[in-house]
């Protein structure tokens, strides 16, 4: 993925986190990213395709931070649990607890309306649940 596409995805990820997917208009995406409509459609076929890229980005980010960075480490279960909770709390405190979880918000907003989004988001939460269960079984 080129850096411009990555920049767009990161910027829109913040927009979706603060406003939601449905409430974010294409005009806002264009204004925040500083690209024109033609450039947007060069990179993405639709807002939905961008939404999928944002979900993939958020899942990859959280997978790296929570799974690889904490739950897959050779640490005592109590330390893993504390690190995981600290990570989630830090994420919440970045926005004074006002925005919620970026992935959780998208899951609540989109799961009933889009099967692909629902599948991707559900898979992430299932993997997280399995990792926590394995940790608790240690």
Predicted regions and their residues:
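Generic hydrophobic, amphipathic alpha-helix propensity
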Residues: 4-12, 29, 54-58, 62, ...
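Helix-turn-helix
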Residues: 7, 14-49, 53
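Short coil/turn segments at alpha/beta junctions that flank glycine-rich nucleotide-binding fingerprints
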Residues: 18-22, 73, 99
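A general structural signal for well-ordered alpha-helical segments in protein cores
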Residues: 26, 47, 51, 81, ...
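Hydrophobic alpha-helical connector segments
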Residues: 53, 68-98
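Amphipathic alpha-helical segments used for helix-helix packing
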Residues: 95-116
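A surface-exposed regulatory interaction patch that couples sensing to output
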Residues: 97, 101, 120, 135-138
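Hydrophobic alpha-helical bundle segments that form small-molecule/ligand-binding pockets
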Residues: 113-115, 125-138
């Amino acid at each position: 993925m080129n850096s411009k596409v990555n920049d767009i995805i990161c910027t829109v990820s913040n927009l979706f986190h603060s406003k939601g997917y449905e409430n974010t208009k294409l005009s806002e995406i264009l204004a925040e990213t500083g690209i024109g409509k033609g450039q947007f459609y060069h990179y993405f076929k639709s807002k939905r395709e961008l939404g999928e890229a944002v979900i993939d980005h958020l899942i990859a980010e959280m997978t790296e931070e929570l799974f690889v960075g904490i739950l897959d480490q050779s640490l005592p279960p109590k330390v893993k649990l504390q690190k995981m909770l600290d990570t989630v709390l830090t994420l919440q405190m970045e926005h004074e607890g006002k925005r919620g979880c970026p992935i959780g918000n998208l899951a609540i907003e989109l799961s009933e309306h889009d099967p692909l989004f629902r599948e991707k988001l559900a898979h992430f939460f299932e993997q997280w649940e399995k990792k926590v269960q394995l940790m608790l079984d240690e």
